[in-house]
Curated annotation (Swiss-Prot):
Keywords: ATP-binding, Cytoplasm, Disulfide bond, Nucleotide-binding, RNA-binding, Transferase, tRNA processing, tRNA-binding. It is found in: Cytoplasm. This is tRNA-specific 2-thiouridylase MnmA. SUPFAM superfamilies: Adenine nucleotide alpha hydrolases-like (SSF52402). GO terms for cellular component: cytoplasm. Belongs to the MnmA/TRMU family. The record marks 138, 354 as: Interaction with tRNA. It comes from Coxiella burnetii (strain CbuK_Q154). It catalyses: S-sulfanyl-L-cysteinyl-[protein] + uridine(34) in tRNA + AH2 + ATP = 2-thiouridine(34) in tRNA + L-cysteinyl-[protein] + A + AMP + diphosphate + H(+). It comes from the Bacteria.
Length: 371
């Protein structure tokens, strides 16, 4: 059994080694920094600014997050450096998301941010400051088996974030640490409260990071030109108008404004598909409508965490959403960048642009983008 990189069995570092911690101002990264500090490592904090915003923006929490990060760094007794990656974030994450939205897909910016910003730009910056590793407050584990690194699920199945880390490579895992991967979220909050952290009860961040709590439609309108169009049934019957298909995702119920039709039952309507060429939103009625379910998908942009990819066909588990239970499937290789995934049971609301992530037991193998 290899070395698992979390608090109950940290890597065999020299205690005078410098470990940088990505301090977000949240409770998870704060406790991660505390754990490392109390194990005798020299810890430095790094706060990322990934989005340029007006300080008066009521929806942006960056100013408060930085204030919290400074307070925690002072409380623990570590230095804190502020680094601005807004240009890199725009080029490698946000622009990609805009392109995907414009094509009617639903991207996952957290996945790209982890690969391109946190575990690339931030890791590189940490190295320049003399750190040997970058630590974050992610709920996941890293295992070293004969210098091959495996990404494992967190001990807290409800908070596991391996789904969002599936694009990391061997170098990134070898130079990263997840100090709270062995904890339950409740334990992390209890530690923070016991130590008097001001953020011990701070709400977890949710949604798309650069949008914050503002309305998704209002934000996207600032960057993309919306084209209103028809809402149709699969049979082609026009039953309403949409504001722009980029605002909707498969499985969505809210915001359609087509309920209470005299020619339909009382069951709610759900988005089942988006016809980008015709600019048409296709909807069906009822949560269990058969067209909302599919037993297969194809994916592209394949990435395998280990240097040697698995043999195909591969029977394993998969997730098409981060909080979904593992689903049994068979993966068949189509070419170097595409594969076919056949599920044992039909899956609801498979969404183009989202990630499908593969698992064998607790190990995250990698994944791809649903096509």
């Amino acid at each position: 059994m290899g070395i698992i990189f979390y608090t109950t069995q940290m890597p065999n570092f020299e205690q005078n080694q410098v470990i940088a911690v990505g301090l977000s101002g949240g409770v998870d990264s704060s406790v991660a920094a505390l754990v490392l500090k109390e194990k005798g490592y020299e810890v430095i904090g790094l706060f990322m600014q990934n989005w340029e915003t007006d300080s008066k923006d009521p929806f942006c929490t960056a100013e408060q997050d930085l204030s919290d990060a400074k307070a925690i760094a002072d409380h623990i007794g570590i230095p804190l450096y502020v680094v601005n990656f807004s240009k890199a974030y725009w080029n490698h994450v946000f622009q990609h998301c805009l392109d995907e939205f414009a094509q009617g897909r639903t991207p996952n910016p957290d996945v790209w941010c982890n690969r391109e910003i946190k575990f690339k730009s931030l890791l590189d910056h940490a190295k320049k400051l003399g750190a040997t590793h970058l630590a974050t407050g992610h709920y996941a584990c890293i295992q070293n088996e004969n210098n091959e690194y495996r990404l494992l699920k967190s001990n807290d199945s409800h908070k596991d974030q391996s789904y969002f880390l599936h694009l990391l490579n061997q170098y990134q895992l070898a130079n990263s640490v997840f100090p709270i991967g062995g904890y339950q979220k409740s334990e992390v909050r209890a530690i923070a409260k016991k130590r008097g952290f001001i953020n011990h009860a701070k709400k977890d961040s949710t949604g798309i990071c650069f949008i914050g709590e503002r309305k998704f439609k209002d934000f996207l309108n600032e960057f993309l030109l919306a084209q209103p169009g028809n809402i149709e049934t699969p049979e082609g019957k026009i039953i309403g108008k949409h504001d722009g298909i980029m605002f909707y995702t498969v499985g969505q119920r809210k915001g359609l404004h087509i309920g209470g039709r005299p020619d339909a039952g009382e069951a709610p309507w759900y988005v089942v598909d988006k016809d980008v060429k015709r600019n048409v939103l296709i909807v069906v009625q009822g949560y269990e409508h058969p067209l909302l379910y599919s037993q297969e998908l194809t994916c592209t942009n394949l990435h395998w965490i280990r240097d040697t990819e698995p043999s195909f066909p591969l029977t394993c588990k998969a997730k098409t959403r981060c909080r979904q239970a593992d689903q049994t499937c068979v993966i068949t290789r189509l070419d170097n960048d595409h594969c076919h995934v056949q599920f044992e049971h039909p899956q609801r609301a498979i969404t183009r642009g989202q990630s499908v992530v593969f698992y064998l037991g607790n190990e995250c193998l990698g994944g791809g983008i649903i096509n």
